[in-house]
C-alpha cells in the first residue's frame, strides 16, 4: 500500500536523497543530468510564496520512500485589459492576474514505476492547489520525456501550452569583453521593481510579487544597458530613476537580472565517454593557459557545477539585441567570478531578443514543453477567458525561483 503525505525533513531526508540518486533527468541510455540539492530537497520551491512537498511511502514495518513531488503557488499575469478609468489620451493597459500553481520535481523510484505512484502524487498535489485557491496548474518537461508527457497530458488532463527555449552557455576560463559602445548600469532593487512593473507587468507569467524576487538574497542584481555617450551612459550620477528613464528612454536599451542557482543546487552530467571528458578538459586547460586567445572551452560539466540564471530579459530599440548581448557578457563575467560552469536563460521561442543571448546548441533545449490545466470549472471566464486556450505572446517572464 502506498501512502502519500507531507515531507518531514527530520525523517525523510535520507530516503528522498536515495530516490533522487536513482532517478535521472533525460532519456535513458544517454547523457543524464543529475541534481545535487545540497541537503535541501525543497530548495527549488522554498523561495515561493506558498509551497509543499509530498512523499510517497510504501511498507508497513520497514517503510520506504518511493517517490516525491514538489509544488508551489503564486499570482502571475495571464492577460491584459484596457484601464477604462485612466483619464489620458493614450490607452493604458493593465495586467490580469490569476493564481497559478507549479508542479516540479516529480520523482518515482525506478523499482516502483508503472504502479500509479506518480499519478497519485500529482492528484494529491492538485488537491492542495485547489484548497489554496489556485485556478491553474502547469508543469515543465522535455519534449522527448514521453513518460512524463503521457502522464500529464493523458492521465492528468493537462494540455500542451507553451514551448520556450532554454539557452545555455558555458563559462569560459577567460573574461568576455563587453562592448565599449555600451554602458552597463546596476539598479537598486526598488528601481528594478519600478522598471519591471511599468514595462513588463503585462508579460505572461510575470510574478505579482516581483519585489520579493528582486530582494531575494539569490538575486545578484538587475542591469540596464544603454548606449555609451547617451545622457544615461555618461558616468556616475546619470541615472534619474526608472520612471523618468522610461519616460525619456534612449534610442535602444535592454535589461537583465541574474539569479544565483549555485547556492541552491549543483548539476552534473553523467554517462559521458572517456574521450568526451578528455576533450573537455583539454579545451579548459588551453583556455586557462592562453586566455588571450579567447578560445571557447567546454565547461567542467562532468563533475558538480553551478549556474547563474538570467531572467527578466527585455529591451527596446533597433540595437536592443546588441544591448542584450552586452548584458549577457556582463552576466558571464559575474558567473566566472562566482565559480559557475554555465549561464542559462529561458525565453519564448519567438522572442526577438533571444538572438542576443549567446548559447551552445548542444547544451540548450530549443523547445522546453510547458503543459497547463484548469483546476476548476466553477471559475468564471471573466475578462481573460480560459487561459489554457489563449495564444502565445511574443515573450514570457520566467520566474527564477522555479528554474
Curated annotation (Swiss-Prot):
Induction: By ethylene. It comes from the Eukaryota. GO terms for molecular function: N-acetyltransferase activity. Disruption phenotype: Unable to develop apical hook in the dark. Reduced length of dark-grown hypocotyls and reduced leaf initiation rate in light-grown seedlings. PROSITE patterns: GNAT (PS51186). Pfam families: Acetyltransf_1. The keyword Secreted does not apply. Keywords: Acyltransferase, Growth regulation, Transferase. One of its GO terms (biological process) is photomorphogenesis. Its EC number is 2.3.1.-. It is an enzyme of class 2 (transferase). InterPro entries: Acyl_CoA_acyltransferase (IPR016181), GNAT_dom (IPR000182), Plant_NAT (IPR052810). Residues 2-177 form the N-acetyltransferase domain. Belongs to the acetyltransferase family. Ethylene-responsive N-acetyltransferase required for differential cell elongation in the hypocotyl. Regulates apical hook formation of dark-grown seedlings. May control differential cell growth by regulating auxin activity. May be involved in negative feedback regulation of auxin homeostasis through the control of GH3-like genes. Modulates de novo shoot organogenesis. This is Probable N-acetyltransferase HLS1.
